[in-house]
Amino acid sequence: MIAVIGGGASGLMAALTAAEHNDEVVLLERQPRVGRKLLSTGNGRCNLSNINAAPQKYHGADVQFVQPALAAFGVPDTIEYFRGLGLLTVCEADGRIYPWSNQAGSVVDVLRLAAAGRGISLRTDCQVTALRQTAAGFALELGEHRLLADKVIVCCGGLAGGKVGGSGSGYALLQGLGHTCTRLYPSLVQLKTDNTFVRALKGVRAKLPWHQHEHL
């Protein structure tokens, strides 16, 4: 049996992929429902991908770190994968790809239906409090219960989106198995200001130039 910890986008995709090989798959989600954070992505529309996705579009010390992922499962693969699940998509002028319905709920629905169709057991309100390796595989502590699995896929997500379930609980589970964690930094964050004049701008996106070290 394969246990997937986390019922977000990565957890659902991992569970579906594992089930393609006729393995018994159980997905464990600590919240009352799966895909909750997905519902808030793209201002509620769920930005699935971007037709212009490429390593040079990323920023950081090693912009090539995404190359293996894009080579293994690129944008065309993403579009075709969701089409196979019954989800039609639309590409906007700026390259962003959304579900045709413009509703993030459509993405969650097709993933849930696909999981049910492939016999994946979805267990919600089920938090993994500890994870350890055994001679036969892995033991997952679920409060008063224990689950034994041959393989485990950890898809708990990070600290982002605390209001919709982000907790970073997966870090502790992985560190307990001997993995290390680099220092965490916030990425997309709010700017604090007086709400009096900006309340009406909620949900509005704008492309602005960024100046740093005299460079645009």
Predicted regions: what is each one?
Residues D23-V26, T89, V152, C181:
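Hydrophobic anchor at the start of a short beta-strand
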Residues I2-A3, V152:
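Receiver (REC) domain switch-region micro-motif
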